[in-house]
A protein has these predicted regions:
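Solvent-exposed, flexible loop/coil segments flanking beta-strands in beta-rich domains
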Residues: 1-35, 116-123, 129-135, 146-152
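C-terminal functional module detector
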Residues: 120-124, 142-147, 332-499
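Beta-sandwich interaction modules
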Residues: 64-88, 98-100, 446-452
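A metal-dependent hydrolase metal-coordination microenvironment
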Residues: 142-143, 148-284, 288-314, 320, ...
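Non-catalytic propeptide/linker segments at domain boundaries
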Residues: 86-156
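Short beta-strand-plus-loop segments that form exposed binding edges in beta-rich domains
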Residues: 36, 94-103, 463-468
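Surface-exposed beta-strand/loop patches in noncatalytic accessory domains
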Residues: 2-11, 35-77
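Extracellular and analogous surface-interaction loops
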Residues: 18-28, 80-88, 400-404, 452
Length: 499
């Protein structure tokens, strides 16, 4: 079997181009061959559907090898594919262009390219991996959310926003796991642009399947998914902002129905900021408050200012009585040895890190702790312990304490080799400086008693900065009492922040 399918890229071409090919009953695997420069391949998403209309492969072509395999074993199947029986009949390839960027970077030129479809297999370097997650219907039937990776009760360190070659990252899953080990991560969320991992290489790091819903009006990660959502096709195929707002509303409702988590990413960052002002806050589970801090070297992006605004937004939401978990994401795309222009630090998974205190490390437990908001976001912190006591009972960040609580006892430990952490606490937005001490210049400890004002609603947040006011820690607030919401949409928050 062999056929050659023709496609074109220009600002005048259709965003979605479809071609069909026939697969005989004797076929055991399919190989797809193409040739495109990397920067052009980044503009192309490819989806393959079988004769039953099921998605069997989805990927942003990007930085990957130019050979794609789809077979019955993980060794024959490229990342983003589903290894299963190759059904005889009419298969379909969809090529979906990132038309927003095509219009931006293309003048009147046109690039023609072909995809050769054959049953003669080639070696696959970017194969699926031994841990298969998805079945033939793209449900995460083989992903065990209860599998315990570590039984111990402690703080676990991870990253909630990452990329590989499945979308526009430059590293394979195997390589990003090496970097995750280097950063001492316990968990890692795989969040690609509008495409989803179907499996992963064997690893002792807990990998969470997620997706970064990526549109021209904003980006958000989804966690705790049980299957590939149908709306991914709509997201990939549409650019109309009014229609996208409707899709975002449906995504929000779908997440609540599916008990999935929705987290807005880099809400104020440059070209990729959140633009859907009418988005209802009641559907927001998490908020990314620190996104790839190394990107601050790109001056026009104003990434540091964007992250500080996101931190202010999180505080604003807590002050208004919302329980939206602040988390961090490296958004790492680059190689280990690669730096943004002007940067002295490389973008890497785990910078920033998000910590969760858990009685054993497993996926379902992570989702539960995010819903409780018991997370702490850090930079330059190698180890961490936060012990807070309300009426003699130990509580975590994000806890709701009894109305009878008049004070909190706190003990905080931070390990940082390169930066001295200045600890502080915000009580209803009022800042108090706290003392940390160290005997060796890297292990810092402090303790004290914090009085809580007599108010109907109080929120108490511990944080840390370096002596040069660089972000080091954000512990989600502890709250007492309740307050009625005054903010209902993203636009309401922007008005309070005066942006």
């Amino acid at each position: 079997m062999e056929c050659i399918l023709d496609f074109s890229i220009s600002k005048y071409e259709k965003k979605v181009q479809t071609a069909a090919f026939e697969v005989p009953s004797s076929c055991l695997a399919i190989c797809f061959l193409y040739e495109l420069p990397e920067q052009i391949a980044l503009l192309v998403n490819m989806i393959v559907e079988d004769p039953s209309g099921r998605v069997r492969f989805q990927k942003q072509l990007g930085y990957s090898e130019k050979v794609i395999g789809l077979g019955q074993s993980y060794m024959d199947t490229t990342i983003g594919g589903i290894s299963n029986t190759i059904e005889a009949g009419t298969w379909t390839i969809k090529v979906i262009l990132a038309s927003e960027y095509v219009k931006k970077f293309f003048a009147d030129e046109k690039i023609n390219f072909t995809i050769t479809v054959t049953d003669e297999m080639r070696p696959i370097e970017e194969h699926l991996g031994e841990d298969i997650w998805a079945d033939a219907d793209f449900r995460y039937a083989m992903y065990d959310t209860e599998r315990v990776f570590n039984p111990n009760k402690r703080w676990y360190k991870g990253d909630f926003h990452t990329h590989t070659r499945l979308s526009d990252g430059k590293e394979t899953p195997e390589r990003v796991m090496e970097k995750a080990h280097f950063m001492n991560l316990d968990f890692y969320a795989a969040t690609e642009h509008n495409v989803m991992h179907t499996g992963w290489p064997k690893t002792d790091i807990l990998v969470l399947p997620g997706v970064e819903i990526t549109t021209s009006i904003g980006h958000a990660n989804l966690f705790g998914l049980k299957k590939r959502p149908d709306f991914l096709d709509e997201i990939l195929e549409n650019d109309n902002e009014e229609l996208l707002e409707d899709i975002w509303n449906r995504i929000a409702v779908w997440c609540k129905e599916q008990e999935a988590l929705l987290s807005i990413n880099h809400p104020f960052l440059y070209l990729w900021k959140w633009k859907y002002s009418g988005f209802p806050l009641e559907y927001l589970s998490c908020l990314e408050i620190v996104n790839d801090p190394t990107y601050a070297a790109v001056k026009e992006a104003k990434a540091k200012e964007a992250n500080m605004l996101a931190i202010r937004m999180a505080d604003c939401l807590w002050a208004d009585g919302y329980r939206i978990c602040a988390i961090g994401g490296s958004d790492s795309h680059n190689r280990m040895d690669e730096f943004y222009d002007g940067a002295t630090e490389n973008s890497i998974a785990g910078d920033p890190a998000t910590w969760l205190y858990m009685e054993g490390l497993y996926a379902c437990g992570i989702y539960q702790e995010l819903k409780k908001c018991s997370a702490c976001v850090t930079r330059y912190v190698e180890d961490l312990d936060i012990a807070i006591y309300a009426n003699g009972k130990k509580v975590l960040p994000g806890a709701i304490i009894p109305d009878s609580t008049t004070s909190l006892e706190w003990e905080i430990y931070i390990k940082s080799k390169d930066y001295f952490p200045k600890l502080f606490v915000l009580v209803n937005g009022q800042r108090q400086e706290l003392l940390l001490e160290s005997d060796d210049g890297q292990n810092y400890v402090g303790s004290g008693v914090l009085e809580i004002p007599k108010k109907d609603y109080c929120w108490i947040r511990f944080g840390a900065e370096s002596i040069h006011n660089e972000f080091m820690m954000y512990a989600n607030p502890i709250t007492r009492g309740k307050t009625a919401h005054k903010l209902y949409t993203f636009e309401d928050v922007k008005a309070v922040l005066e942006i």
